[in-house]
Amino acid sequence: MKKIIIGNWKMNKTVSETRDFIQKFDIFYQENVGKIKEDLDFAIAPSFISLSLISKSLTKKLEIAAQNLSQFDSGAFTGEISGKMLQDLGTKYVIIGHSERREIFKEKDEELKNKILQAQKYDLIPVFCVGESLLEFEAGLTKKVIISQINAIKSVLNFQKAIIAYEPIWAIGTGKTATAAIAEKVCGMIKENFGKDTTVIYGGSVNSKNINELVSQKSIDGALVGGASLDPEEFGKILVNS
Protein backbone atom coordinates (compact mmCIF):
# COMPACT_ATOMS: atom_id res chain seq x y z
CA MET A 1 0.00 0.00 0.00
CA LYS A 2 1.23 3.52 -0.81
CA LYS A 3 2.48 5.56 2.12
CA ILE A 4 1.14 9.01 2.94
CA ILE A 5 2.57 11.82 5.07
CA ILE A 6 0.31 14.70 6.15
CA GLY A 7 1.66 17.73 7.99
CA ASN A 8 -0.83 19.27 10.41
CA TRP A 9 0.23 22.83 11.18
CA LYS A 10 -2.59 23.49 13.67
CA MET A 11 -2.86 27.24 14.48
CA ASN A 12 0.62 28.18 13.30
CA LYS A 13 2.16 30.29 10.51
CA THR A 14 0.89 33.51 8.97
CA VAL A 15 0.40 33.87 5.22
CA SER A 16 3.87 35.38 4.81
CA GLU A 17 5.41 32.60 6.91
CA THR A 18 3.61 30.05 4.76
CA ARG A 19 5.05 31.60 1.59
CA ASP A 20 8.52 31.42 3.13
CA PHE A 21 7.99 27.76 4.07
CA ILE A 22 6.90 26.84 0.55
CA GLN A 23 9.89 28.55 -1.05
CA LYS A 24 12.33 26.72 1.25
CA PHE A 25 10.50 23.40 0.96
CA ASP A 26 10.49 23.60 -2.84
CA ILE A 27 14.27 24.11 -2.84
CA PHE A 28 14.81 21.17 -0.48
CA TYR A 29 12.50 18.96 -2.51
CA GLN A 30 14.21 19.73 -5.81
CA GLU A 31 17.60 19.00 -4.28
CA ASN A 32 16.45 15.72 -2.73
CA VAL A 33 13.69 14.45 -5.03
CA GLY A 34 15.80 11.47 -6.06
CA LYS A 35 15.88 10.28 -2.43
CA ILE A 36 12.08 10.33 -2.04
CA LYS A 37 10.03 7.30 -3.04
CA GLU A 38 8.04 7.99 -6.20
CA ASP A 39 4.87 6.44 -4.78
CA LEU A 40 4.94 8.49 -1.56
CA ASP A 41 1.95 10.83 -1.22
CA PHE A 42 2.25 13.93 0.95
CA ALA A 43 0.19 16.94 1.95
CA ILE A 44 0.18 19.92 4.29
CA ALA A 45 -2.77 21.15 6.35
CA PRO A 46 -2.15 24.87 7.03
CA SER A 47 -4.63 27.35 8.47
CA PHE A 48 -7.67 28.12 6.32
CA ILE A 49 -6.25 31.49 5.21
CA SER A 50 -3.15 29.78 3.79
CA LEU A 51 -4.80 26.86 2.01
CA SER A 52 -4.62 28.42 -1.44
CA LEU A 53 -0.88 29.06 -1.05
CA ILE A 54 -0.11 25.34 -0.98
CA SER A 55 -1.26 25.10 -4.60
CA LYS A 56 1.36 27.72 -5.50
CA SER A 57 4.15 25.32 -4.57
CA LEU A 58 6.43 24.26 -7.41
CA THR A 59 6.31 20.78 -5.89
CA LYS A 60 3.28 19.56 -7.80
CA LYS A 61 3.03 16.36 -5.75
CA LEU A 62 2.31 18.44 -2.63
CA GLU A 63 -1.41 18.12 -1.91
CA ILE A 64 -3.69 20.40 0.10
CA ALA A 65 -5.21 19.16 3.36
CA ALA A 66 -7.63 21.05 5.61
CA GLN A 67 -7.68 20.87 9.39
CA ASN A 68 -11.46 21.01 9.69
CA LEU A 69 -14.72 21.66 7.85
CA SER A 70 -18.28 22.56 8.72
CA GLN A 71 -20.91 19.94 9.38
CA PHE A 72 -23.29 22.13 7.35
CA ASP A 73 -23.52 22.48 3.58
CA SER A 74 -24.01 26.26 3.36
CA GLY A 75 -26.01 29.09 4.87
CA ALA A 76 -26.05 31.35 7.93
CA PHE A 77 -23.20 29.74 9.85
CA THR A 78 -20.82 32.60 10.63
CA GLY A 79 -17.18 31.59 10.68
CA GLU A 80 -17.67 28.17 9.09
CA ILE A 81 -15.87 26.71 6.05
CA SER A 82 -17.83 24.25 3.91
CA GLY A 83 -16.76 21.14 2.07
CA LYS A 84 -17.74 22.78 -1.20
CA MET A 85 -15.38 25.68 -0.49
CA LEU A 86 -12.54 23.27 0.25
CA GLN A 87 -13.26 21.26 -2.89
CA ASP A 88 -13.20 24.43 -5.00
CA LEU A 89 -9.71 25.21 -3.68
CA GLY A 90 -8.43 21.82 -4.78
CA THR A 91 -8.25 20.34 -1.29
CA LYS A 92 -7.71 16.57 -1.22
CA TYR A 93 -7.81 15.66 2.49
CA VAL A 94 -9.62 16.96 5.56
CA ILE A 95 -8.82 16.13 9.17
CA ILE A 96 -11.87 15.19 11.23
CA GLY A 97 -12.15 14.28 14.91
CA HIS A 98 -8.73 15.43 16.10
CA SER A 99 -8.46 15.12 19.88
CA GLU A 100 -7.93 18.88 20.23
CA ARG A 101 -11.28 19.51 18.56
CA ARG A 102 -12.99 16.83 20.62
CA GLU A 103 -11.57 18.17 23.88
CA ILE A 104 -11.38 21.94 23.40
CA PHE A 105 -14.35 22.48 21.08
CA LYS A 106 -16.46 19.63 22.48
CA GLU A 107 -17.12 18.00 19.10
CA LYS A 108 -19.35 14.95 19.55
CA ASP A 109 -20.00 11.86 17.44
CA GLU A 110 -23.08 13.25 15.67
CA GLU A 111 -21.20 16.35 14.53
CA LEU A 112 -18.26 14.21 13.38
CA LYS A 113 -20.62 12.01 11.36
CA ASN A 114 -22.08 15.09 9.68
CA LYS A 115 -18.58 16.35 8.86
CA ILE A 116 -17.67 13.00 7.32
CA LEU A 117 -20.82 13.12 5.18
CA GLN A 118 -19.96 16.65 4.03
CA ALA A 119 -16.39 15.64 3.19
CA GLN A 120 -17.51 12.64 1.18
CA LYS A 121 -20.21 14.64 -0.60
CA TYR A 122 -17.50 16.89 -2.02
CA ASP A 123 -14.96 14.14 -2.75
CA LEU A 124 -12.64 15.06 0.11
CA ILE A 125 -10.78 12.22 1.80
CA PRO A 126 -11.57 12.20 5.54
CA VAL A 127 -8.59 11.71 7.84
CA PHE A 128 -10.47 10.48 10.89
CA CYS A 129 -8.49 10.73 14.12
CA VAL A 130 -8.74 8.29 17.01
CA GLY A 131 -6.69 7.94 20.16
CA GLU A 132 -6.67 7.18 23.85
CA SER A 133 -5.61 9.22 26.88
CA LEU A 134 -2.65 8.28 29.07
CA LEU A 135 -5.00 6.97 31.76
CA GLU A 136 -6.82 4.80 29.23
CA PHE A 137 -3.52 3.55 27.82
CA GLU A 138 -2.16 2.64 31.25
CA ALA A 139 -5.45 0.93 32.14
CA GLY A 140 -5.19 -1.30 29.07
CA LEU A 141 -8.27 0.26 27.46
CA THR A 142 -6.67 1.26 24.14
CA LYS A 143 -8.47 -1.33 22.00
CA LYS A 144 -11.85 -0.65 23.60
CA VAL A 145 -11.52 3.13 23.17
CA ILE A 146 -10.32 3.01 19.56
CA ILE A 147 -12.98 0.54 18.42
CA SER A 148 -15.67 2.60 20.17
CA GLN A 149 -14.53 5.80 18.44
CA ILE A 150 -14.61 4.18 15.01
CA ASN A 151 -17.87 2.32 15.64
CA ALA A 152 -19.49 5.68 16.41
CA ILE A 153 -18.99 6.84 12.80
CA LYS A 154 -18.59 3.65 10.78
CA SER A 155 -22.17 3.76 9.48
CA VAL A 156 -21.33 6.85 7.38
CA LEU A 157 -17.62 6.39 6.63
CA ASN A 158 -16.52 4.93 3.30
CA PHE A 159 -13.45 3.07 4.56
CA GLN A 160 -12.17 2.55 1.00
CA LYS A 161 -11.87 6.32 0.53
CA ALA A 162 -10.78 7.40 3.98
CA ILE A 163 -7.78 7.39 6.30
CA ILE A 164 -7.82 6.43 9.96
CA ALA A 165 -5.18 8.32 11.95
CA TYR A 166 -4.18 6.72 15.24
CA GLU A 167 -2.92 9.51 17.49
CA PRO A 168 -2.52 8.52 21.14
CA ILE A 169 -3.43 11.68 23.03
CA TRP A 170 -0.52 11.14 25.42
CA ALA A 171 1.93 11.39 22.51
CA ILE A 172 0.62 14.57 20.84
CA GLY A 173 3.09 17.42 21.25
CA THR A 174 4.63 15.82 24.32
CA GLY A 175 7.81 14.50 22.80
CA LYS A 176 6.63 11.03 23.77
CA THR A 177 6.14 8.66 20.88
CA ALA A 178 4.40 5.33 21.03
CA THR A 179 7.05 2.75 20.26
CA ALA A 180 6.88 1.34 16.76
CA ALA A 181 5.68 -1.91 18.32
CA ILE A 182 2.81 -0.19 20.16
CA ALA A 183 1.82 1.82 17.08
CA GLU A 184 1.95 -1.30 14.91
CA LYS A 185 -0.18 -3.26 17.36
CA VAL A 186 -2.93 -0.63 17.42
CA CYS A 187 -2.86 0.07 13.67
CA GLY A 188 -2.97 -3.68 13.02
CA MET A 189 -5.92 -4.01 15.37
CA ILE A 190 -7.79 -1.32 13.43
CA LYS A 191 -7.21 -3.19 10.17
CA GLU A 192 -8.30 -6.48 11.74
CA ASN A 193 -11.57 -4.96 12.91
CA PHE A 194 -12.42 -2.61 10.04
CA GLY A 195 -10.77 -4.14 6.97
CA LYS A 196 -7.21 -5.06 6.02
CA ASP A 197 -7.32 -2.58 3.12
CA THR A 198 -8.17 0.34 5.43
CA THR A 199 -5.48 3.04 5.28
CA VAL A 200 -4.18 3.59 8.80
CA ILE A 201 -1.52 6.16 9.70
CA TYR A 202 0.17 7.08 12.98
CA GLY A 203 0.50 10.48 14.61
CA GLY A 204 2.14 11.69 17.80
CA SER A 205 5.57 13.37 18.02
CA VAL A 206 6.64 12.04 14.62
CA ASN A 207 9.93 13.39 13.28
CA SER A 208 12.66 12.62 10.75
CA LYS A 209 14.47 10.38 13.23
CA ASN A 210 11.59 8.01 14.05
CA ILE A 211 9.59 8.09 10.81
CA ASN A 212 11.45 5.25 9.10
CA GLU A 213 10.91 2.76 11.91
CA LEU A 214 7.24 3.71 12.09
CA VAL A 215 6.41 3.43 8.39
CA SER A 216 8.44 0.24 8.09
CA GLN A 217 5.80 -1.52 10.17
CA LYS A 218 3.41 -3.78 8.29
CA SER A 219 0.19 -2.05 9.38
CA ILE A 220 1.32 1.60 9.39
CA ASP A 221 0.58 3.32 6.07
CA GLY A 222 2.04 6.71 6.86
CA ALA A 223 2.01 9.51 9.40
CA LEU A 224 0.14 12.59 10.57
CA VAL A 225 2.96 14.94 11.53
CA GLY A 226 2.51 17.87 13.89
CA GLY A 227 5.28 20.20 15.06
CA ALA A 228 7.97 18.62 12.90
CA SER A 229 6.06 19.63 9.76
CA LEU A 230 6.47 23.34 10.55
CA ASP A 231 10.11 23.31 9.48
CA PRO A 232 10.54 22.91 5.71
CA GLU A 233 13.82 21.00 5.93
CA GLU A 234 12.59 18.71 8.71
CA PHE A 235 9.38 17.97 6.79
CA GLY A 236 11.49 17.26 3.73
CA LYS A 237 13.71 14.91 5.72
CA ILE A 238 10.61 13.06 6.90
CA LEU A 239 9.69 12.48 3.26
CA VAL A 240 13.23 11.32 2.45
CA ASN A 241 13.23 8.88 5.37
CA SER A 242 9.73 7.49 4.78
From Swiss-Prot:
Quaternary structure, per UniProt, is: Homodimer.
Q: Which GO terms describe its cellular component?
A: cytosol
Q: What is its pathway?
A: Carbohydrate biosynthesis; gluconeogenesis; Carbohydrate degradation; glycolysis; D-glyceraldehyde 3-phosphate from glycerone phosphate: step 1/1
GO terms of molecular function: triose-phosphate isomerase activity
Q: Which Pfam families match?
A: TIM
Q: Which SUPFAM superfamilies match?
A: Triosephosphate isomerase (TIM)
Q: What is its main location?
A: cytoplasm
Q: Give the reactions, separated by semicolons, that this protein catalyses.
A: D-glyceraldehyde 3-phosphate = dihydroxyacetone phosphate
Q: Gene3D superfamilies, alphabetically?
A: Aldolase class I
Q: Which residues bind substrate?
A: N8, W9, K10, G173, S205, G226, G227
* Task performed by this protein: Involved in the gluconeogenesis. Catalyzes stereospecifically the conversion of dihydroxyacetone phosphate (DHAP) to D-glyceraldehyde-3-phosphate (G3P).
Family (UniProt): Belongs to the triosephosphate isomerase family.
Record-listed E.C. numbers: 5.3.1.1
Entry protein name: Triosephosphate isomerase
Task: Name the species this protein comes from.
Answer: Mesomycoplasma hyopneumoniae (strain 7448)
Q: Where in the cell is it found?
A: Cytoplasm
Q: State the superkingdom.
A: Bacteria
A Gene Ontology biological process in which this protein takes part is:
gluconeogenesis
Root EC class: isomerase
Q: Which HAMAP family match?
A: TIM_B
Catalytic residues of the enzyme: H98, E167
Q: Which UniProt keywords apply?
A: Cytoplasm, Gluconeogenesis, Glycolysis, Isomerase
Q: Which InterPro entries match?
A: Aldolase_TIM (IPR013785), TIM_sf (IPR035990), TrioseP_Isoase_bac/euk (IPR022896), Triosephosphate_isomerase (IPR000652), Triosephosphate_isomerase_AS (IPR020861)
